[in-house]
Amino acid sequence: MVRYRVRSPSEPSHEVYRQQLHGQEQGHHGQEEQGLSPEHVEVYERTHGHSHYRRRHCSRRRLRRIHRQQHRSCRRRKRRSCRHRRRHRRGCRTRRRTCRKH
């Protein structure tokens, strides 16, 4: 999930900012997003107060959070399966190996 900053009604639209930044009107909104270089993205975020930019999918904090959730859920699953079944089961061993890789 990507969070977007909510724009107040009095604040100018996204396109107005872009026109001021580039000095020209561009085409479709989706194409504009792809046309920005990484330097322009950083400048744009700083000058226009966008804390969550759309193209930034995986921040380190987000990746770490996802990784921790997977690891925890994986551990939980392993414990449950081991308690109710025999300890020396192949599935449990292979799961343990894959869990430690993450």
Swiss-Prot record:
Its main location: nucleus. Belongs to the protamine P2 family. It is found in: Nucleus; Chromosome. Residues 49-102 have a biased composition (Basic residues). GO terms for cellular component: nucleosome; nucleus. Residues 39-48 have a biased composition (Basic and acidic residues). This is Protamine-2. Interacts with TDRP. InterPro entries: PRM2 (IPR000492). Residues 1-102 are annotated as: Disordered. Testis. It comes from Pan paniscus. The lineage of its organism: Eukaryota, Metazoa, Chordata, Craniata, Vertebrata. Keywords: Chromosome, Developmental protein, Differentiation, DNA condensation, DNA-binding, Nucleosome core, Nucleus, Phosphoprotein, Spermatogenesis. Proteolytic processing into mature chains is required for histone eviction during spermatogenesis. Transition proteins (TNP1 and TNP2) are required for processing. One of its GO terms (biological process) is nucleus organization. GO terms for molecular function: DNA binding. The modification Phosphoserine is found at S8, S10, S37. Coiled coil: none annotated. Protamines substitute for histones in the chromatin of sperm during the haploid phase of spermatogenesis. They compact sperm DNA into a highly condensed, stable and inactive complex.
